[in-house]
Amino acid sequence: MLYGILAAASALLLTAVLSAAVRLPALRLGIVERRRGRRVPVLGGVAVMAGVGAVAWVGEWSGVAPLGQEAGRLIVAGAGLGLLGLVGDVWRLPAVLAAAGVVAAAALVVPYHELGVLGGVCGIAWIALVVHGFKGMTRSDGALGVVGAVTAFALSGCAAAEVMDGLATLFSVLAAALTGFLMHNWPPARVVLGTCGALFVGFVLAGGVLHVYAVGYGAGVGAPFALTAVATVDAVLVLVSRKRAGRELWRGGPDHLAHRLRRIGLTPPGVVVVLGMLAAGSAGVGLAIHMLWTEPGTAWWVAGAAGAVVLGMLFVPVGPPRGARAGAGSGTGVVPAADGAVARRARATGARDGPTGVHRVPGAAARRSIPGGRAPGPSPRPSHLGRQEAAELGRRGWVG
């Protein structure tokens, strides 16, 4: 008990420190992605993976909390997937290769002895689906951190009930590490998990659910589904919507659950809160089913709610969130730096193009002078404060 508290606290603090430490190297090396016009480092997954691995290794090395065979395979396979994702964060990684890596790693950790060959194959497919759902949450600040922490916390309770101490410790450490990471990932995020963290967290959680289910399968398949309902909903929503639209299933786009919640008017923190509440509700049902506090049929309510969410979100158009300015090339309401430079030069000089009586406005058609009337005068010169603000926005790479 005491070691569990110390391990969770250590993982939280260590991951928080590492998440702050990886920002500067990622910015200098250009391992970033643009979110709403900001350059955000994508090495948060390295911090989470290092924090969880360090605490787990200390417990195994000291003999105070040995992980056991199941937890050891999970963390090693998850770390391998995380390294594969890190390659994708630094260089472009084909989606097919990432999917093949998930399938290969799942094939190494599935408990065939308890599930059988057919059950093991179904487990591999289910792990791939859930990992895909968790991976999609990285596109929204804070979403994967909150949903992953809630799921890991509930899963640690399930593992403790089955006296799987190694897995229970691993999941509690992962929940604490994600909580520490959220200190830097809450909207607007200062660092994100990237593909590395998404594959590591998603795989450890999905594989852990399968291991716990293999031991306590008397509760039925409702508990594993409820524990990962939010990730499953996101994966199914994306696959169905892309299939209906005739798009490639593995090509990314703004069609995940978090994107659609933004489209209906939620703010970025609001999206995180809603997803966290959904994850807490569904994971709580899964924990209750596994602990035999409620009937296994309760999972049908979760399945019905999940189906309603998928059907409802299919009618939400895919695109930039409401309130984003039209004409933004990236769909985020941010004017590209090149267009902003042209507009700033035009405002700063108040230049005229063409003969007298014609004043050309950048990006708009020229206005003809009225015969016998006065020609439009030049645009007023911006104030000194306006020029300073435009220069600062241009230095950051965006306008507006």
Task: Kindly give the residue locations of the regions a language model identified.
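"…together with the soluble PPM/PP2C metallo-phosphatase catalytic core" -> "…together
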Residues: 1-235, 286, 384-398
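Cytosolic, membrane-interface loops and tails of multi-pass inner-membrane proteins
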Residues: 17-42, 237-269, 329
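Membrane-interface capping segments at transmembrane-helix boundaries
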Residues: 21-23, 312-328
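Juxtamembrane transmembrane-helix termini
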Residues: 158-161, 165, 215, 241-244, ...
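Structural signal for the N-terminal portions of transmembrane helices
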Residues: 216-225, 292-302
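Alpha-helical transmembrane segments of integral membrane proteins
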Residues: 263-285, 290
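Small-residue-rich transmembrane alpha-helices that serve as helix-helix interface/gating elements
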Residues: 297-313
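Long, low-complexity, intrinsically disordered cytosolic termini of multi-pass membrane proteins
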Residues: 321-400
